[in-house]
Swiss-Prot record:
Family: Belongs to the class-II aminoacyl-tRNA synthetase family.
Protein name per its UniProtKB record: Alanine--tRNA ligase, mitochondrial
Originating organism: Homo sapiens
Keywords in alphabetical order: Aminoacyl-tRNA synthetase, ATP-binding, Cardiomyopathy, Disease variant, Ligase, Metal-binding, Mitochondrion, Neurodegeneration, Nucleotide-binding, Premature ovarian failure, Primary mitochondrial disease, Protein biosynthesis, RNA-binding, Transit peptide, tRNA-binding, Zinc
Protein role: Catalyzes the attachment of alanine to tRNA(Ala) in a two-step reaction: alanine is first activated by ATP to form Ala-AMP and then transferred to the acceptor end of tRNA(Ala). Also edits incorrectly charged tRNA(Ala) via its editing domain. In presence of high levels of lactate, also acts as a protein lactyltransferase that mediates lactylation of lysine residues in target proteins, such as CGAS. Acts as an inhibitor of cGAS/STING signaling by catalyzing lactylation of CGAS, preventing the formation of liquid-like droplets in which CGAS is activated.
Gene from which the chain derives: AARS2
Length: 985
């Protein structure tokens, strides 16, 4: 018995350390199989169990786009949306702050970053890039180990009917190095539930200690495993459910400290659970995937899916089935959540997923063009009831998938042509150039997967320059690092321990309502009130709480009240100063304010001593605040104008503003045209010109849920929430019958705004670019900056008009035409870089680039005419013979080459070399050798002999060549040319 338990333990250890996977090695029937249950029923049973039996609140799945978490590419676990609770930073006024016990089914994507299953999808029967995580949570010690284990056991054995003898348990065995004891409490809980000791096994921190990241909340976990073998032979164990008990915090120095509050965080993959309950050895055999696999077979007329892996999967047909089925689910979910295929970050990962799916469907399953988009309705059918956003956006998802598939196929065809053209220039032993492969790849212009490029070359029997490709990849990484936005210096911050201590002491959250205490004077200027406050806490730069700070010390201040706006919601923090009561002549500069779990932390420099309990008076930088207010109100107007112009499907994806400019990211079906950009600006100008009142009011969050047209972001809002309405009182705007939110700007927003729109002055969109397919970033300025942008635009328009007139008059000679072309080139650069209306930039660039083409055409015509004239002069000067060596005036090397070419056309048996003196002693050289004089006499060698004498260089071929040099003795150069040619003839 002991030996069998030890063997089972070793098997479990190996299974865990290889990462849990359904290996599908055993196809014997499962004993005591539970009755088949649809995936939708399994999901519903989980949620209903925790809601109805154990009083959990059901919360919707968060978007797979991480909310304010730059450490993640995608939401990859159920706990992601609850990080503010674990870190203690949740807004105490928000709905989330009231969460005690919750449950949900969370959409998760693991493709890129630390958790990346992309390349494993298709190779086995378990990996997915998209999956659903069923989870239940208890926050702040609502319940802990005993209740969590009891609930999990009850659900699995009583609700789902999984036989107890098929469940195995692992728990934390301790970590002496970290000073952590074995989690015997959890072990004893499982034993008390009747799990035999032989199936309760202990493991170290690698398997049973869960951490959020390098730092942050963490704790021991216990895992429930399912035995696929059902007691027949050795156990085949797969992880089913992970229960994490967060009770520690990993500090920056690597040490562990107890958390102020303990939490329970559990996660169970729906796909794996459904496979168990439906008696399947693979998640792909469940009803979550079978409709997709059937649709793939019908659409591709491929052989049926048989679930084969490895060498048994001849032709990789079943691998392709799994790749396509998984990837179309991921694409559909991501696009419905506003992540579109693009060129960097999550959009780039999504682009790779789409192109991987197209490759497998096209190359292996022989799918027809447009096939991938046809699978979207099947995804919506299987997941749409649980995630309604799939139903709402199904048409957009299908269109985007089909468009990107078509673009990829076009790129593939272009790539084949480029490869064939490049191969024709290579020698038998040459490697394929890394530069060309790079331009074909996902990092270059065409976006082809690099392994596909390598496969195409392999089929041609050509080896890729891998070393060169690695060098280019390193250069690209360095370039991206240089181009990346500089990381903002981390300001003072309150960690989970500091926040926990404040809560333990009963320190109330900062009252920041005074930030809204400002008014509009009859003169049109704003009056910002001061704020009286008391110092409640002081922190040094390293976050240590102190009783006082001294002269010159950078510190953080917590006050009972503040009129400073803390950075959030895309709006920059206020700045200003504070003075101590009775000492108004000593200013304490405040550089920024940040929100930390409901507390506003002011970052200041103390010119003198400051102590706990001191009374202070706060003053915001009025010009800075007013600039932020104008940009924020302008952002709302711009957001509304975009919807009015482009349609109601235009959604804000994010924004950032400061007094200098505003940035707004929005969903767009296609890039904006100049006409649309101008129309958006005009709509904003109209609202500004009407000088409408801006109404702001706090209302219960529930009142905003069903208001048509009201705009909000995927953020956690406080309750009550502030509503900002332009031109319509908030009460009227929130009346669903009024439809007011469809006619004007009405948004949930905690920022500071103008009281009337007229103070925006003007708005000019100065830039736009596609962040990804379907997402556009707009840059805009307001007020005086906008007027300056318009004036500069008009000035450049006049310059373009003048250039047009100059071009229409024509040029007398090549030199004049070249000067005009250079002037037009400088004008193009000026238009491209100017801060001016973007719609006007687009129009002027189209015009000025057309002028450039016309100017170049005029130059070529003048050069041809000049070359013809000089050709005749030279032919008249030289009698018919085998050689012409002479000097001629030419404005450029291209003109000189044309003269040489025309001479040789009119005298085919003559070899020609011409020199053209230029300013500063520079000399141009061009030559061509008659066909009859080769191969002993070559143009490249001829030009090199002459140019090297002049200290220059030459290049070309056996027939034609050119070069440059510098000399004051042209006769000597001509003599060398003559002598060399005669020696070769």
């Amino acid at each position: 018995m002991a030996a069998s338990v030890a063997a089972a333990a070793r098997r479990l250890r190996r299974a865990i350390r290889r990462s849990p996977a359904w290996r599908g090695l055993s196809h014997r029937p499962l004993s005591s199989e539970p009755p088949a249950a649809k995936a939708s029923a399994v999901r519903a049973a989980f949620l209903n169990f925790f809601r109805d039996r154990h009083g959990h609140r059901l919360v919707p799945s968060a978007s797979v786009r991480p909310r304010g978490d730059p450490s993640l590419l995608f939401v990859n676990a159920g706990m992601n949306q609850f990080k503010p609770i674990f870190l203690g930073t949740v807004d105490p006024r928000s709905e989330m702050a009231g969460f005690r016990r919750v449950a949900n089914s969370q959409k998760c994507v693991r493709a890129g970053g630390h958790h990346n299953d992309l390349e494993d999808v298709g190779r086995d029967l378990s990996h997915h890039t998209f999956f659903e995580m069923l989870g239940n949570w208890a926050f702040g010690g609502e319940y802990f180990k005993e209740e969590a284990c009891n609930m999990a056991w009850e659900l699995l054995t009583q609700v789902y009917g999984i036989p107890e003898e098929r469940l195995w348990i692992s728990y934390f065995d301790g970590d002496p190095k970290a000073g952590l004891d074995p989690d015997l409490e959890t072990r004893d809980i499982w034993l008390s539930l009747g799990v035999p000791a032989s199936r309760v096994l202990s493991f170290g921190p690698q398997e049973n200690f869960w951490e959020m990241g390098d730092t942050g909340p963490c704790g021991p976990c216990t895992e429930i495993h399912y035995d696929l073998a059902g007691g027949v032979g050795a156990p085949q164990l797969v992880e089913l459910w992970n229960l994490v008990f967060m009770q520690h915090n990993r500090e920056a120095d690597g040490s562990l400290q107890p958390l102020p509050q303990r939490h329970v965080d559990t996660g169970m993959g729906l796909e794996r659970l459904v496979a168990v309950l439906q008696g399947k050895h693979s998640t792909y055999d469940t009803d979550l995937f079978s409709p997709l696999l059937n649709a793939i077979q019908q659409g591709c007329r491929a052989p049926p899916y048989l679930g084969r892996v490895g060498v048994a999967d001849e032709g990789r047909t079943d691998t392709a089935y799994r790749v396509v089925a998984d990837h179309i689910r991921t694409l559909s979910v991501c696009i419905s959540d506003g992540i579109f295929p693009g060129m960097s970050g999550p959009p780039l990962v999504l682009r790779r997923i789409l192109r991987r799916a197209v490759r497998f469907s096209m190359e292996i399953l022989k799918a027809p063009p447009g096939f991938l988009g046809s699978l979207v309705p099947v995804v919506v059918e299987t997941l749409g009831d649980a995630y309604p956003e799939l139903q709402r956006n199904s048409a957009q998802i299908a269109n985007l998938v089909s468009e990107d598939e078509a673009a990829f196929l076009a790129s593939l065809e272009r790539g084949r042509r480029i490869i064939d053209r490049t191969l024709r220039t290579l020698g038998p032993s040459d490697m394929f150039p890394a530069e060309v492969a790079w331009s074909l790849s996902l990092c270059g212009d065409l976006g082809l997967p690099l392994d596909m490029v390598e496969l195409m070359l392999e089929e041609k029997g050509v080896q890729l320059d891998s070393a060169g490709l690695e060098r280019l990849a390193q250069e690209e990484a360095q370039h991206r690092a240089r181009q990346a936005e500089p990381v903002q210096k981390q300001g003072l911050w309150l960690d989970v321990h500091a926040l926990g201590e404040l809560q333990r002491q009963g320190v109330p959250p900062t009252d920041d309502s005074p930030k809204y205490n400002y008014s509009l004077r009859p003169s049109g200027s704003y009056e910002f009130g001061t704020c009286e406050a008391q110092v409640l806490q002081l922190y040094t730069e390293d976050g240590t709480a102190v009783a006082s700070v001294g002269k010159g010390q950078r510190c953080g201040l917590l006050l009972d009240r503040t009129n400073f706006y803390a950075e959030q919601g895309g709006q920059a923090s206020d700045r200003g100063y504070l003075v101590r009561a009775g000492q108004e002549d000593v200013l304490f500069p405040v550089a920024r304010a940040q929100v930390c779990g409901g507390f506003i932390l002011h970052e200041a420099v103390a010119p003198e001593c400051l102590r706990l309990g001191d009374q202070v008076q706060l003053h915001v930088d009025e010009a800075w605040r007013l600039g932020c207010m104008a940009k924020h109100t302008a952002t709302h107007l711009l957001n509304w104008a975009l919807r009015q112009t482009l349609g109601p499907g235009t959604e804000q994806q994010g924004s950032h503003l400061n007094p200098e400019q505003l940035r707004l990211d929005v969903t767009t079906q296609t890039p904006l045209t100049p006409e649309q950009l101008r129309a958006v600006e005009n709509t904003v100008q109209e609202a500004v010109g009407q000088d409408e009142a801006v109404y702001m009011e706090e209302v219960p969050l529930a009142l905003t849920a069903q208001v048509p047209g009201l705009r909000s972001l995927d953020e956690v809002y406080p309750d009550p929430v502030r509503v900002v309405s332009v031109g319509v009182p908030v009460a009227h705007a929130l009346d669903p019958a009024s439809q007011a939110a469809l006619q004007t700007s009405v948004e949930l927003c905690c920022g500071t705004h103008l009281l009337r729109t007229g103070a925006v002055g003007d708005l000019v969109i100065i830039g736009d670019r596609q962040l990804s397919k379907g997402t556009t970033r707009l840059l805009a300025v307001t007020g005086e900056q906008a007027q300056q942008a318009r004036e500069l635009g008009q000035s450049l328009a006049q310059e373009v008009k003048a250039a047009t007139e100059r071009l229409s008059l024509g040029s007398r000679d090549v030199a004049e035409a070249l000067r005009l072309s250079k002037d037009i080139g400088r004008l193009i650069e000026a238009v491209e870089t100017a801060v001016m209306p973007q719609w006007q930039r687009r129009e002027l660039l189209a015009t000025v680039k057309m002028l450039q083409r016309r100017a170049n055409t005029a130059i070529r015509k003048l050069q041809m005419g000049q070359a013809a004239k000089k050709t005749q002069e030279l032919l008249e000067r030289h009698s018919k013979g085998p050689l012409i060596v002479d000097t001629v005036s030419a404005e450029s090397l291209s003109v000189l080459v044309k003269v040489v070419r025309q001479l040789c056309e009119q005298a085919p048996s003559t070899s020609v070399l011409l020199l053209s003196p230029q300013p500063m002693g520079k000399v141009l050289c061009a030559c061509q050798v008659a066909q009859g004089a080769m191969p002993t006499f070559t143009a490249e060698a001829w030009a090199l002999a002459v140019c090297s004498h002049m200290g220059g260089k030459a290049w070309g071929s056996r027939v034609v060549a050119q070069g440059t040099g510098s000399t004051t003795d042209l006769e000597a150069a001509l003599s060398i040319a003559q002598t060399y040619a005669l020696s070769q003839l």
